[in-house]
Amino acid sequence: MMNLRVLFLALLLLASPLLQVARCQSDAEDHSSLVDDVVGENTDDAVEEDDHDLDMNLSSFPGVETVCVFPKNSAKLVPAGEETELLVGLKNEGKTRVGVMGIRASVHLPYDHKLLVQNLTMLRLNNASIPTSLQATFPYIFAVSQYLQPGAFDLVGYIIYDVEGKPYQSVFYNGTIEVVESGGLLSGESVFLLTLGIGLLLLLGLWAYSQVQRLTKKTKKVSKVEVGTRSTEASLDEWLEGTTLAKTSSGKTKNKKN
């Protein structure tokens, strides 16, 4: 009965992290949906008018080359909820001036870019001019949602520019980034797995201890029965001494000797 109580308490301890994770996820989803509703109501109209020219499906212009670098972050690790910087380079190999209008990016699921995860910050550059045969570098700082689950995602970035009054865009990055949890070396999943492993080891230790205790008790019981039998036989011999049966037995023994 005691072992059952211990096992029940251990199971409760193991289940408590699951309940906390589920509760945190539900709270995060509710908070995220609330933020999206509020932000959408207050900013949709203004952003739609201001960034309409930067959010169109545009083609690239021949002679414009782009490059992207994650400074001091070759692994492309992006902490959720924290700012991440990348450098966007644009080289003008054409025959006319290029005016850079802005930079935009978005996060997608790696297996299907039609499934949008998050639109990132729109950076307006106000037609920064790049003469022919020259290049320029622009820092772009973005932050993915703090509620985004750690894992691999695809980042797609565009730089929008103007050539002779007509807008164009070129892709400067289309690849995988690794979203990680911020504020610690261990993620929530790692802590949970570590707790689960320790709990299983404790349960295994309790089970082994109970088996050893059971075998020890059985050994003690068997040894007591043997001692009791010997003492009973000795007491019977003492009780038979001096009785008729004992005398008869001794007489038969003497006759056999004669």
From Swiss-Prot:
Phosphorylated in its cytoplasmic tail. Disulfide bonds: none annotated. It is found in: Endoplasmic reticulum membrane. Pfam families: TRAP_alpha. Its main location: endoplasmic reticulum. It comes from the Eukaryota. InterPro entries: TRAP_alpha (IPR005595). Glycans are attached at residues 57, 119, 127. Residues 25-190 are lumenal. One of its GO terms (cellular component) is plant-type vacuole. It is a single-pass type I membrane protein. Residues 210-258 are cytoplasmic. Residues 1-24 form the signal peptide. The chain crosses the membrane at residues 191-209. Shows a remarkable charge distribution with the N-terminus being highly negatively charged, and the cytoplasmic C-terminus positively charged. TRAP proteins are part of a complex whose function is to bind calcium to the ER membrane and thereby regulate the retention of ER resident proteins. May be involved in the recycling of the translocation apparatus after completion of the translocation process or may function as a membrane-bound chaperone facilitating folding of translocated proteins. Belongs to the TRAP-alpha family. Heterotetramer of TRAP-alpha, TRAP-beta, TRAP-delta and TRAP-gamma. PANTHER family: TRANSLOCON-ASSOCIATED PROTEIN SUBUNIT ALPHA (PTHR12924:SF0), TRANSLOCON-ASSOCIATED PROTEIN, ALPHA SUBUNIT (PTHR12924). This is Translocon-associated protein subunit alpha. It comes from Arabidopsis thaliana (Mouse-ear cress). The lineage of its organism: Eukaryota, Viridiplantae, Streptophyta, Embryophyta, Tracheophyta.
